[in-house]
Amino acid sequence: MAVYNYDVVVLGSGPAGEGAAMNAAKAGRKVAMVDSRRQVGGNCTHLGTIPSKALRHSVRQIMQFNTNPMFRAIGEPRWFSFPDVLKSAEKVISKQVASRTGYYARNRVDVFFGTGSFADEQTVEVVCPNGVVEKLVAKHIIIATGSRPYRPADIDFHHPRVYDSDTILSLSHTPRKLIVYGAGVIGCEYASIFSGLGVLVELVDNRGQLLSFLDSEISQALSYHFSNNNITVRHNEEYERVEGLDNGVVLHLKSGKKIKADALLWCNGRTGNTDRLGLENIGIKVNSRGQIEVDQAYRTSVPNIYGAGDVIGWPSLASAAHDQGRSAAGSIVDNGSWRFVDDVPTGIYTIPEISSIGKNEQELTQAKVPYEVGKAFFKSMARAQIAGEPQGMLKILFHRETLEILGVHCFGYQASEIVHIGQAIMNQPGEQNNLKYFVNTTFNYPTMAEAYRVAAYDGLNRLF
């Protein structure tokens, strides 16, 4: 058994692990990275964020070709299979792996492929694919092993018609009808993707409203758009059992209803990848979801061991995970890079997409904050008309008296890009966070960013 000594060992090469390893390496620390897959990138690159967003992009292109009258001069609408669309995602994954492999090499981060587990508080044993065991001894260890779909024990996920958000990427056919169980972010995104391919989608929601953490107007807009695009949403429903058939699946609900489809996609909950880490050897406990508790410095109950990303829970976003990993390493190297990551924009890649940051109307009303609303509807925006993307709106919530921006909510074309302008102004100190910035600043024309100016004028016109 070979023994290696490091300043920092990072478990997991997803966004959190990458952020941690790069920050520690650039601070001059000797760093090792351990990943159970034989390629870097983690679930984000191989099973989650990257493939699903690449799929979404391809599906949007197909939808534009099939619905834009201009393209009828080229040919009639075309049908594309899910495996065909998946090929574009596979190319993106390969490019991402190559890029990230280069990052680790340039920054002298040693990468070990294999299953890592704790022997003690400073030792990680890595069982490599060839059976060889490597021992890594480190002053500090960062757990960034991510999460995986939660699988109830009473559902047979080995059945060829039952999938979760990881295994759906191995789907070898295009179902005519698909049940998506769980209407969280992942469920809504995949419902959009399959609907765009012409699949009839039954979206089963445990709650009474889609994505209830969103501003209610944005949530309602998504529901309306789903209803117009072959997605049937069933609220306040829970599964009783899943019956696998030779040619499909039947979902039995506790309400007594039954839904039959060609396949079932389970998108209800995730659990932290902690069960194979040997945490019992170092006294770290996990919650019912397999997640690790950390403090604001991202330190666990063991002083030299840190956690970041999905494995610690909220907000379980790739963007936040990278910053959490970087901050965890910042707590170790003390280079001024630590911050508690809480100003996180939400990006939901449905079709159309959604993004928001700050408070929503429900929260401001409950807190009795005197706010006003400014809106810009994309159907009136020149850039949206040019792009053929008239659906959606930008909504700014601001304080009636100080004009401080309290929240930005966007539904539609380029929403996840547009939100960052509002985020930048919201993060300005004191009076610099002001709605008037948008009416006193010249925007390129025509752009989607111009929606901020339109929404600001709309909001100011409401004041008296």
From Swiss-Prot:
GO terms for molecular function: dihydrolipoyl dehydrogenase (NADH) activity; flavin adenine dinucleotide binding; NAD(P)+ transhydrogenase (Si-specific) activity. InterPro entries: Class-I_Pyr_Nuc-Dis_Oxidored, FAD/NAD-bd_sf, FAD/NAD-binding_dom, FAD/NAD-linked_Rdtase_dimer_sf, Pyr_nuc-diS_OxRdtase, Pyr_nucl-diS_OxRdtase_dimer, STH_gammaproteobact. GO terms for biological process: 2-oxoglutarate metabolic process; NADP metabolic process. The gene is sthA. Its cofactor is FAD. Keywords: Cytoplasm, FAD, Flavoprotein, NAD, NADP, Oxidoreductase. The lineage of its organism: Bacteria, Pseudomonadati, Pseudomonadota, Gammaproteobacteria, Pseudomonadales. It is found in: Cytoplasm. This is Soluble pyridine nucleotide transhydrogenase. It comes from the Bacteria. Its EC number is 1.6.1.1. Its main location: cytoplasm. Conversion of NADPH, generated by peripheral catabolic pathways, to NADH, which can enter the respiratory chain for energy generation. GO terms for cellular component: cytosol. Belongs to the class-I pyridine nucleotide-disulfide oxidoreductase family. It comes from Pseudomonas entomophila (strain L48).
